Amino acid sequence: MSLSESLAKYGITGATNIVHNPSHEELFAAETQASLEGFEKGTVTEMGAVNVMTGVYTGRSPKDKFIVKNEASKEIWWTSDEFKNDNKPVTEEAWAQLKALAGKELSNKPLYVVDLFCGANENTRLKIRFVMEVAWQAHFVTNMFIRPTEEELKGFEPDFVVLNASKAKVENFKELGLNSETAVVFNLAEKMQIILNTWYGGEMKKGMFSMMNFYLPLQGIAAMHCSANTDLEGKNTAIFFGLSGTGKTTLSTDPKRLLIGDDEHGWDDDGVFNFEGGCYAKVINLSKENEPDIWGAIKRNALLENVTVDANGKVDFADKSVTENTRVSYPIFHIKNIVKPVSKAPAAKRVIFLSADAFGVLPPVSILSKEQTKYYFLSGFTAKLAGTERGITEPTPTFSSCFGAAFLTLPPTKYAEVLVKRMEASGAKAYLVNTGWNGTGKRISIKDTRGIIDAILDGSIDTANTATIPYFNFTVPTELKGVDTKILDPRNTYADASEWEVKAKDLAERFQKNFKKFESLGGDLVKAGPQL
């Protein structure tokens, strides 16, 4: 079947030109053309990378995510009053109209068609075809997904198709049961995703992550929102779970270790494997000193999003006037220390949960029991500091099951069950690492956090003397090489330890309230959480 014929199946006709699997050189030329206007236009920065703006949407739009309700989607973890999530149902009738709208938008014009893999394991990867009219969106997926060899592209038949019609608006969204003129919709029967009225690149990346999160656990394979790395021999694999901004990319990109990937992984009988062929790093306040590897990856073929660039092409990473969620996507080979030739490694021995606790309660590292591992995985806690009108900064807690509830398409307990089975089989140990704040009012330094990670990875934490933290019953080391001893017990960072107690009780209550929805899983699990 010719490419035009396959596009016609998706409702796209009359393409005036199809650029199929463009090279980085072709994309650079296309996205920086002087004739481009608005959000299509890329600006070349002095670092060599192109910067683009994504308009109103500088992040994903979870309120606009829908899944077609049909026989193929019966296993989906639908949103409910008890378990609010982003998996909202939409009808087949609405889907037909949205597909026609995307088809109309993408017809009779030049297009980019990019064929890529999601998943480094041949047996379980998805073959994905992306169709879009915007050059830099084709660049984004070329950076972020796994690029097939010429041999693999011969006779490429997609398992999943993504139509990105970011210029089209859903005018009749109310009658279709949608939330706004924007829609990100999946149809599991047709194996297709449609994107309408949002330019944010991450919708394509996280859309396919949601699909891997559906297909893999049903086969007993863990699908995880985590980064992963291994030692220089490729034997001592570690995975880092965490929500956005907790340090997944920063901590897994370590000059002493080989990076497997920075955000999405599977864990099967062969070990841990990356879903992606690139990294999508936050760049707010990025510095060469603190994150040399990420800094070095921002060069020609990297794609910056929503950063401020002056007339001379100079980038201001501290400027968050457009968004705090400034990003860069780059092919994984922009990082020197990576696992080659395929981003996979043996089963993990160390599982690290990253949490940026703005309450200043959690220890910088806790050694978790098996039941605590399940409890804190299902809780998926982090907290942000949100400014209030009078300049007081109040911590806002986030509980996101499995450190990625926004991307789960099956119930959280399924992911926990599969992860724990994999950990038991490999003898992996789990640790909760707080990359947030303590009683000093300052964020725990990257230097101390890196020292903690080193102690986890070299095993020295397992032989350290320990103490127990009240309410949470956490086991914490009392001394670790290269880490300020004072911070290991969070109570020592407060001028008055009773201040920690007040905050600890408050946070413990929040954990208990959040976990009520999992109480049916049994008393042992509930007891593994904070006790007042």
UniProtKB/Swiss-Prot annotation:
InterPro entries the record matches: PEP_carboxykinase_ATP (IPR001272), PEP_carboxykinase_C (IPR013035), PEP_carboxykinase_N (IPR008210), PEPCK_ATP_CS (IPR015994)
One of the record's GO molecular function terms: ATP binding
Binding site for Mn(2+): K206, H225, D263
Pathway(s) the chain acts in: Carbohydrate biosynthesis; gluconeogenesis
GO term, biological process aspect, one: gluconeogenesis
pH-related activity note: Optimum pH is between 6.7 and 7.1. The enzyme is stable from pH 5.0 to 9.0. It completely losing activity at pH values lower than 4.5 and retaining some activity in the pH range 9-12.
Amino-acid positions noted as binding ATP in the UniProt annotation, renumbered to this chain: 206, 225, 242-250, 291, 327, 443-444, 449
EC number, UniProt record: 4.1.1.49
Cofactor: Mn(2+)
Note accompanying the cofactor annotation: Binds 1 Mn(2+) ion per subunit.
Activity: how regulated: Inhibited by p-chloromercuribenzoate.
Residues binding substrate, per UniProt: R60, Y200, K206, S244, R327
Reaction it catalyzes: oxaloacetate + ATP = phosphoenolpyruvate + ADP + CO2
Domain of life the protein comes from: Bacteria
Keywords for this protein: ATP-binding, Cytoplasm, Decarboxylase, Gluconeogenesis, Lyase, Manganese, Metal-binding, Nucleotide-binding
Assigned GO CC terms: cytosol
Family the UniProt entry places it in: Belongs to the phosphoenolpyruvate carboxykinase (ATP) family.
Subunit structure as annotated in this protein's UniProt entry: Monomer.
Function according to Swiss-Prot or TrEMBL: Involved in gluconeogenesis. Catalyzes the conversion of oxaloacetate (OAA) to phosphoenolpyruvate (PEP) through direct phosphoryl transfer between the nucleoside triphosphate and OAA.
Protein name: Phosphoenolpyruvate carboxykinase (ATP)
Organism: Anaerobiospirillum succiniciproducens
